[in-house]
Amino acid sequence: EADTSILLLSYTNRAVDEICSKLKEQSIDFIRIGSEISCDKAYHANLLRNKIQQCRTGDAVAGTLKDARVVCATTAALNSNVNLFKIKRFDLAIVDEASQILEPHLLGLMCARSGNADAISRFVLIGDHKQLPAVVQQTEAESRVTEPELLSIGLTDCRRSLFERLLSSFKTVDG
């Protein structure tokens, strides 16, 4: 739908640039959250900083954000810019490479508020838990969960992504 506000997220800047590439191919306008250092030159004009450069008032900045139908970012970049949710809410967030993203990178976004409403209404997680696992440095012993409340929701190892944990909780007997 034309008025649906979509947030496209991924773990790496390269993956976000790939998303931006597909949007450009389809002539879909978007805002990219990030910096010129982390973003391919082809998308510098789409960076939020550059999109609002001509805005002379706070209302003009807010209007630019509110009017943006598609916003792209890494989870880290969005977590660093949560003030965005004071201005804009999203109908849908699509998270690519979700199997690489640990829960702390997503939980803040999933719980974010915009006024009295959820900042993001729905999430779609896309990934392959057998292909791109979360990147962690902790050992199995350091990552083992022992808290009964966390174990009760299937959180047994802090090295597993939310995507993998959710997937395993919905697997059937047949696999």
Predicted regions and their residues:
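ASCE P-loop NTPase motor cores of helicases and related translocases
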Residues: E1-V71
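Conserved helicase motor core of SF1/SF2 NTP-dependent helicases
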Residues: T4, Y11-R14, Q26, A76-L78, ...
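Conserved helicase/translocase P-loop NTPase motor core
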Residues: T57-K86, H105
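Short conserved micro-motifs at the rims of enzyme active sites and ligand-binding pockets
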Residues: C20, A42-A45, N83-F85, V135-Q137
